[in-house]
């Protein structure tokens, strides 16, 4: 887990780290560009501490945002959704991947950021589906932020392999015959 956190921002594993993070800086720059165009963005991370770093930065810049993690009450959750959906000044919705996986309809968003890849591609798809709902009138753009030469690239390859295995399983007449024991274990791991 520490390798995944370090790929996002070294400060996630070393609070005393006082230098820049290329990935974090890229996320901030991309947010500034998109928000300047009056777009709305869902920002997902599997690390609440990562969202907290982003939250601290946004508070210092005055960019309007909503925030949702698993620690929020149902009422806070509903208020955050309402604020993002209805207030033009609320440009971003920071959401922990697990908290945002179920029961959210966020059609005001036209951009989705995945700040860190998750081992299970289905979890990411659930997050992306928050913006792809009935009532969505905008085209939705997805940005996946992946740090080069890190564990994130390996996770991305694993996700692709799992998607391929799932596709084989779904489209084959008798999918179990075409999968080796190793592939079955990978699919359900």
Label each PLM-derived region with a short phrase.
Residues 1-104, 175, 181-189:
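Conserved Helicase C-terminal RecA-like lobe
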Residues 76, 91-179:
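SF2 helicase/translocase ATPase core recognition
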